[in-house]
Amino acid sequence: MGRPEFNRGGGGGGFRGGRGGDRGGSRGGFGGGGRGGYGGGDRGSFGGGDRGGFRGGRGGGDRGGFRGGRGGGDRGGFGGRGSPRGGFGGRGSPRGGRGSPRGGRGGAGGMRGGKTVVVEPHRLGGVFIVKGKEDALATKNMVVGESVYGEKRVSVDDGAGSIEYRVWNPFRSKLAASIMGGLENTHIKPGTKLLYLGAASGTTVSHCSDVVGPEGIVYAVEFSHRSGRDLLGVAKKRPNVVPIVEDARHPHKYRMLVGMVDVIFSDVAQPDQARIVALNAQNFLRNGGHAVISIKANCIDSTAEPEAVFAGEVNKLKEEKFKPLEQVTLEPYERDHAVVVAVYRPVKGKKV
């Protein structure tokens, strides 16, 4: 019996898959097709496969995964098909990959639809609970048929017609994480005028747009021009979103665009966040209005304990005529984050 031929690019993939073979040989190979592959294949690939996720190995095992090696093990593991997290943005990821709205399949993670899906109203106005195999938060889609960041959509027939809901992923939105964490009231409801500081690519802004509805308005402020481009794309399809690409430290630069608002939501992750919120409140927030502030402890003081940082920020808000109402941490969705709700210049005798 002769030695097997080491084919560098042939039809069958050679001894271990060849370098660019058609099928990738017996278990995947370096660049082959069938099951592993560095950039090819059907199941394992680093960047190209159908099932394997981000870490499918360099030609890994039968199912992809971190331990597949160059022509290696049988099933792999870390980012493979059966992984509880599905790789970085893989098939079953509850996080759906973080970051940009161009997340491809990643954002589809989070909820398994099932045949029977029931939608019930949440105690907070404009927010809903989708009950299937798993429960999830959702908002009524203002732009039917459109996903913003790859999130799942659920259509329910209510007799008069079909209503579409967008699943709200708490791993991608700090506001959703705070609701899941038990926040009593976000004060964002249908008809609310909202000033959103730190809008990023418009992920949470799009859900706020759904919540406030056509009677409300969302002024979305983002300093980064790159994120601002994505935000503009969201605003083009949503008439109640006003995109503002400007520094939230200088509210006078956009004072001609923003009217008086009921709520300020802040997610700017800056050391002087309390001051930024106070400046915007002085310009735009009505007396008795509310601020909902997402605090990232590491951005304010990376050496102190998170609880001490949160307490320090609350004290700064008190100095700026805010009265804190409630505070929740965002575990397990975000580490060392808290959301604080405060009322601005509370009106005597009026419920806050």
UniProtKB/Swiss-Prot annotation:
PROSITE patterns xrefs: FIBRILLARIN (PS00566)
Biased composition (Gly residues): 8-18, 26-59, 66-113
Region annotated Disordered, chain positions: 1-115
Entry comment on modification after translation: By homology to other fibrillarins, some or all of the N-terminal domain arginines are modified to asymmetric dimethylarginine (DMA).
Gene Ontology cellular component list: box C/D methylation guide snoRNP complex; Cajal body; nucleolus; nucleoplasm; small-subunit processome
Top-rank EC class of the record's enzyme: transferase
Binding-site residues, S-adenosyl-L-methionine: T203, T204, E222, F223, D247, A248, D267, V268, A269, Q270
Annotated compartments: Nucleus, Nucleolus; Nucleus, Nucleoplasm
Residues with PTM Asymmetric dimethylarginine: 8, 16, 19, 23, 27, 35, 43, 51, 55, 58, 63, 67, 70, 75, 81, 85, 91, 95, 98, 102, 105, 112
Result of knocking out the encoding gene: RNAi-mediated knockdown results in reduced 26S ribosomal RNA (rRNA) expression. RNAi-mediated knockdown in a ncl-1 (e1942) mutant background suppresses the enlarged nucleoli phenotype in the single ncl-1 mutant. RNAi-mediated knockdown in a ncl-1 (e1942) mutant background suppresses the increased 26S rRNA expression in the single ncl-1 mutant.
GO molecular function: histone H2AQ104 methyltransferase activity; RNA binding; rRNA methyltransferase activity
The EC number(s) this enzyme carries: 2.1.1.-
Role this protein plays: S-adenosyl-L-methionine-dependent methyltransferase that has the ability to methylate both RNAs and proteins. Involved in pre-rRNA processing. Utilizes the methyl donor S-adenosyl-L-methionine to catalyze the site-specific 2'-hydroxyl methylation of ribose moieties in pre-ribosomal RNA. Site specificity is provided by a guide RNA that base pairs with the substrate. Methylation occurs at a characteristic distance from the sequence involved in base pairing with the guide RNA.
Protein's UniProt name: rRNA 2'-O-methyltransferase fibrillarin
Species classification: Eukaryota, Metazoa, Ecdysozoa, Nematoda, Chromadorea
Gene name as annotated: fib-1
